[in-house]
């Protein structure tokens, strides 16, 4: 039962689900700064700083790099509706919920969609994309999910990007659960359109969607024969607001821009390479601890930011998650689609990727599972995590 005061003053949680992640105190303080007008010279300067920081985190020189007012789903729609006109052919790789969502969005905007579907928990092989491009040579856009949040799958990208580039199609990438936590060199991989969310590895509240478009993508937009179907997400108008013209388009979420700028500054202060290494280390610690309890991972290529694991046989998925929340204040995610009731998703993103988070969730899970009748060796998980941490530190020294 939720107490009435919890509705007025929400409780402090340890956010270790598929998102949002814990938010840094500095970011929360930035949210509380005075609200400015959306064309105030000071706010326009903050927008410029945010763009510069986004370019660094995306590792791109793309001129059109900005934050869409909306969540990652708005970023997805913005990328699709600006690149696709009715009748255009698009290949979409579906390895989980969010590949399926991209397919749905593309169809709604009139694309002729050709789908590459693989079993949940697996990734798309480059050969599949090469075969599909050969079968559909008029393909304009190839869309795939870099970090499939529903399965914890990490999609290898380099070879795929080379195949798509050689064909001449545009590469659209969902990086909602990877930007700021997993390597994502946009320019090096020749990604033409990429979108993310603020609430995952950037550890900012949800509400903005960072996006970036290559020169090739802008050229495709400029050659459109029809207007972009969405007025709100029309990048030709948003470009004028975020660019030098400063033409009014809509009232931006001012304070969320403050928060995003602060979150990006935190990323750059840590350094992208160190941040990615931190996510890798804590993933290895968590994985070692879970496997010491006899818990198996789902994906063949696991994300370091989102850990998808099988619920042990005979264990009540919802009951364990409820006990984690009520007894320890820890939130983890449930399974989706074919994994509903059969999987847990444990996020280690941004502020939520720390030694404290790993040891807390392992200790809590171990205690709860033991009382639920699951056979395990108490203390084995934390010992395994500590050993994995030591191995990671030795590897860094070497």
Report residues per predicted region.
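N-terminal "arm"/small-domain region of PLP-dependent enzymes with the aminotransferase-like
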Residues: 1-41
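Active-site phosphate-binding strand-loop segment of PLP-dependent enzymes
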Residues: 123-180, 193, 201
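Conserved active-site segment immediately N-terminal to the catalytic lysine
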Residues: 187-199
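Conserved PLP-binding catalytic core of the aspartate aminotransferase-like
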Residues: 296-327
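Active-site C-terminal subdomain of aminotransferase-like
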Residues: 22-23, 199-288, 292, 397-398
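Conserved PLP-anchoring active-site segment centered on the Schiff-base-forming lysine
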Residues: 84-100
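PLP-dependent enzyme catalytic core of the Aspartate aminotransferase-like
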Residues: 338, 342-398
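Conserved N-terminal alpha-helix of the aminotransferase class I/II PLP-enzyme fold
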Residues: 30-78, 97, 101-107
């Amino acid at each position: 039962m939720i107490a009435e005061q919890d509705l007025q003053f929400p409780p402090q949680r340890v956010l270790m689900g598929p998102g949002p992640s814990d938010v840094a105190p500095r970011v929360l303080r930035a949210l509380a700064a005075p609200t400015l007008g959306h064309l105030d010279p000071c706010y326009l300067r903050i927008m410029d700083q945010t763009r510069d920081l986004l370019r660094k985190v995306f590792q791109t020189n793309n001129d059109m790099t900005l934050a869409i007012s909306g969540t990652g789903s708005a970023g997805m729609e913005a990328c699709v509706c600006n690149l696709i006109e009715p009748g255009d052919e698009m290949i979409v790789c579906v390895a989980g919920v969010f590949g399926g969502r991209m397919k749905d969005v593309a169809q709604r905007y009139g694309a002729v969609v050709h789908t590459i579907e693989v079993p949940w928990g697996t990734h798309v092989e480059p050969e599949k994309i090469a075969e599909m491009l050969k079968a559909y040579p008029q393909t304009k856009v190839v869309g795939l999910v870099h970090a499939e949040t529903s399965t914890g799958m990490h999609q290898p990208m380099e070879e795929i990007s080379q195949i798509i580039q050689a064909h001449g199609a545009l590469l659209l990438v969902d990086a909602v659960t990877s930007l700021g936590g997993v390597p994502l060199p946009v320019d090096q991989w020749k990604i033409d359109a990429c979108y993310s969310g603020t609430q995952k590895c950037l550890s900012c509240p949800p509400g903005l969607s960072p996006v970036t478009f290559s020169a090739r993508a802008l050229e495709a937009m400029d050659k459109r024969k029809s207007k972009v179907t969405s007025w709100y997400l029309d990048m030709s108008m948003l470009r004028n607001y975020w660019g030098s013209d400063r033409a009014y388009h809509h009232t931006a979420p001012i304070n969320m821009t403050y928060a995003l700028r602060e979150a990006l500054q935190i990323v750059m202060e840590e350094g992208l390479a160190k941040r990615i290494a931190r996510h890798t280390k804590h993933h290895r610690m968590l994985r070692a601890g879970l496997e010491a309890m006899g818990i198996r991972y789902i994906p063949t290529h696991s994300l370091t930011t989102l850990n998808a694991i099988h619920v042990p046989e005979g264990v009540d998925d919802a009951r364990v998650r409820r006990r984690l929340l009520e007894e320890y204040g820890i939130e983890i995610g449930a399974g989706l689609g074919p994994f509903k009731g059969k999987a847990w998703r444990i996020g280690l993103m941004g502020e939520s990727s720390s030694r404290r988070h790993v040891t807390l969730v392992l200790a809590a899970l171990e205690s709860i599972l033991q009382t639920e009748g699951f056979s395990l060796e108490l203390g084995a998980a934390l010992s395994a995590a500590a050993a994995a941490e030591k191995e990671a530190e030795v590897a860094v020294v070497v």
